[in-house]
């Protein structure tokens, strides 16, 4: 496989600088989509955009198999140096850059194998709905293999090392309402204090126990109750719960136990607790075939001594909706060690930008290896 030239590296770094300097939040990645579309077309891709959402898809080649590379494109809204603004603190600017760089590198190869290479620039990963929208739009219908990439913090792996898959956990966000009864502060026995009910619920949540061998947590992350007056016992409160589990099965059990805890807390006070499940993310589903291809690609580029085992992380990622919702799709996500610190989603997150070149070489190698595997299988079946 041909490698990136110094001229290509500079072009790739320029792309990153532009994307890094122009972050846009979920579902509002308008300029980002336009920029990516132009770059894809400049590189000879057929492109597709969507009438009711951001994001863009580009592809080269034709026929099967269809191998795809996915990059998320949205930024986070967070406080940076005292000002709230969009900020690429989850590395999506680097993911977009690596996907475009992979396309550039593949186009430089003397010959590409028969088949289609698709590049999916997906919106709204941070909101958890972008992957589902791409599935709804039929972007994944004919894909055989799908590869993603995510930069990893130093707490997980060192700069210069890579993992063939990232095993994210499942997450579930729940909004709840406590309906008690207001009363005068001097007559608490006539009311049902929603703050006391919430405190009891926090205690009940802490008593939830499922299989201890599977990492899991449930906690209240937001509580709002009462108004301007401190002498009124609040009858109503709203709260948020954040649930995490390393497997989808454990998440189902955790949700059931959480619902039981809420029922018990409400019954103890003769109150009501209403729950509304908001966005959720599935845990990763390991595909050994795609993972093995990625491991081979990593080994050829940086050596077996720098190949990590699959990374297990409690974070969530909507990339895994693709494996759950699309039958027979083979997926894996490259975990790129890049010296990222102090951590993902930190407003001042930094990483070694030269690591993107490693990611590009690995992704391009994985794509080529996938086609080679398909050709070998077809030849074996023909004989």
UniProtKB/Swiss-Prot annotation:
UniProt keyword annotations, A-Z: Hydrolase
EC number: 3.5.1.-
InterPro entries assigned to the protein according to its UniProt record, in alphabetical order: AmhX-like, Amidohydrolase, Bact_exopeptidase_dim_dom, Peptidase_M20, Peptidase_M20_dimer
GO molecular function term, any single one: hydrolase activity
Keyword Transferase: no
Gene3D superfamilies according to UniProt: 3.30.70.360, Zn peptidases
Family per record: Belongs to the peptidase M20 family.
Protein known as: Amidohydrolase AmhX
Organism field: Bacillus subtilis (strain 168)
């Amino acid at each position: 496989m041909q490698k990136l030239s110094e001229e290509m590296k500079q072009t790739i770094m320029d792309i990153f600088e532009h994307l890094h300097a122009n972050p846009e939040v979920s579902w509002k990645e308008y300029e980002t989509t336009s920029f990516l579309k132009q770059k894809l077309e400049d590189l000879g891709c057929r492109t597709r955009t969507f009438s009711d959402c951001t994001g863009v898809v580009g592809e080269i080649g034709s026929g099967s198999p269809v191998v795809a590379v996915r990059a998320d494109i949205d930024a986070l809204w967070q406080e940076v140096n005292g000002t709230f603004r969009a900020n690429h603190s989850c590395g999506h600017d680097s993911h977009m850059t690596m996907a475009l760089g992979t396309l550039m590198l593949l186009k430089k190869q003397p010959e590409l194998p028969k088949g289609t290479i698709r590049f999916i620039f997906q919106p709204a990963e941070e909101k958890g709905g972008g992957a589902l929208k791409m599935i709804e739009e039929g972007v994944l219908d004919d894909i055989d293999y799908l590869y993603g990439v995510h930069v990893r913090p130093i707490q997980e792996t060192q700069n210069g090392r890579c993992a063939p898959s990232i095993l994210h956990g499942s997450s579930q966000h729940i909004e709840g309402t406590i309906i008690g009864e207001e009363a005068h502060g001097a007559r608490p026995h006539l009311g049902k204090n929603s703050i006391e009910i919430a405190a009891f619920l926090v205690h009940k949540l802490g008593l939830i126990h499922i299989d201890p061998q599977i990492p899991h947590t449930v906690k209240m992350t937001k509580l709002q109750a009462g108004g301007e007056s401190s002498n009124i016992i609040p009858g109503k409160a709203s709260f948020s719960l954040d649930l995490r589990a390393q497997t989808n099965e454990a998440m189902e059990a955790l949700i059931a136990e959480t619902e039981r805890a809420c029922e018990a807390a409400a019954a103890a006070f003769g109150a009501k607790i209403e729950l509304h499940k908001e966005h959720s993310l599935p845990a990763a589903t390991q595909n050994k075939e795609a993972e093995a291809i990625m491991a081979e690609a990593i080994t050829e580029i940086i050596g077996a001594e720098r190949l990590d085992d699959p990374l297990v992380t409690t974070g969530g990622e909507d990339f895994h909706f693709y494996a759950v919702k699309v039958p027979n799709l083979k997926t894996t996500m490259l975990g790129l060690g890049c010296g990222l610190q102090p951590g993902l989603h930190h407003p001042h997150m930094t990483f070694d930008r030269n690591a993107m070149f490693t990611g590009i070489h690995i992704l391009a190698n994985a794509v080529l290896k996938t086609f080679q595997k398909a050709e070998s299988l077809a030849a074996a079946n023909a004989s």
